[in-house]
Amino acid sequence: MNALTAVQNNAVDSGQDYSGFTLIPSAQSPRLLELTFTEQTTKQFLEQVAEWPVQALEYKSFLRFRVGKILDDLCANQLQPLLLKTLLNRAEGALLINAVGIDDVAQADEMVKLATAVAHLIGRSNFDAMSGQYYARFVVKNVDNSDSYLRQPHRVMELHNDGTYVEEITDYVLMMKIDEQNMQGGNSLLLHLDDWEHLDHFFRHPLARRPMRFAAPPSKNVSKDVFHPVFDVDQQGRPVMRYIDQFVQPKDFEEGVWLSELSDAIETSKGILSVPVPVGKFLLINNLFWLHGRDRFTPHPDLRRELMRQRGYFAYATHHYQTHQ
């Protein structure tokens, strides 16, 4: 906890009954809520969207909103306002979402449809240059020769924000577990900015607002560098971040030393949450004030994990960076 903001009362009302889903605080933190669609809701949703294969959602972007409306209607139109309220609430801003009956890699297309529906109730997912679609699926195996830490299993993927090397605002990040075989470890790691004990120190540093260069490796299919500061503020003047240690390119000694100290202070924070995400579940977080990463895996020759991500902008509120749009 730092002096800039304090945890508000948990928005989860123990007396609130929702139609089509349940909502409870997670075991890891009251900031992270667990939302579970009932078996009936899941079954009805999949039946009503069965006519559209994933390719249809790729080709016709308005269908992504159509499937979102179907899901919200099945939840008596309580889902969309709940999602927005939670993700825009500084005291929370994170959900672990599950649909009863979706828990096997054979249902990968159904997983994409469900995640797409949820994401497009809060905004729109951006084009992902790595995959050429509005979402990306990628596999982590025991041996990796890629050019970033995204697929490397035997080391921690450090905490970061998404969207640091693109010009589009990235308000939310969705990360879904599609498959997992011979896996031990590899929990998702999360850190809320207001639980980072060193936030005040780094946010008030002169380099916090200096635009820095961010450049992505070839696998990201992004050739243009972008410039922005590591820190900014939201409409209420509260700190937000746009940071990843792999892609920020310090121009001089001063920036390099400061960024190294920043990285160490984040990775050693006592506020980091370790969250298991079973197959079929996904995390949905506010990317402006949550950092995310991944713990290391135990080596195994047949280790395999497949993930799906979406990241995009909120369409119903303007909680963007104030000085570097």
UniProtKB/Swiss-Prot annotation:
EC nos: 1.14.11.64
- Please tell me whether the keyword Cytoplasm is annotated for this protein: no
The protein's GO terms of the molecular function aspect are:
ferrous iron binding; glutarate dioxygenase activity; oxidoreductase activity, acting on paired donors, with incorporation or reduction of molecular oxygen, with 2-oxoglutarate as one donor, and the other dehydrogenated
Q: What class of enzyme is it?
A: oxidoreductase
- Tell me which family the UniProt entry assigns to this protein: Belongs to the glutarate hydroxylase family.
Pathway(s) where this gene product acts: Amino-acid degradation
GO:BP terms for this protein? Answer: L-lysine catabolic process
Reactions accelerated catalytically: glutarate + 2-oxoglutarate + O2 = (S)-2-hydroxyglutarate + succinate + CO2
InterPro entries per the record?
GlaH, TauD-like_sf
Keywords from the named record: Dioxygenase, Iron, Metal-binding, Oxidoreductase
Residues of the signal sequence? none
Q: How is the cofactor bound?
A: Binds 1 Fe(2+) ion per subunit.
The residues that hold Fe cation are H160, D162, H292
Protein's recorded name: Glutarate 2-hydroxylase
What is the disulfide pattern of this chain? none
State what this protein does: Acts as an alpha-ketoglutarate-dependent dioxygenase catalyzing hydroxylation of glutarate (GA) to L-2-hydroxyglutarate (L2HG). Functions in a L-lysine degradation pathway that proceeds via cadaverine, glutarate and L-2-hydroxyglutarate.
User: How does this protein assemble?
Assistant: Homotetramer.
Cofactor(s) it depends on: Fe(2+)
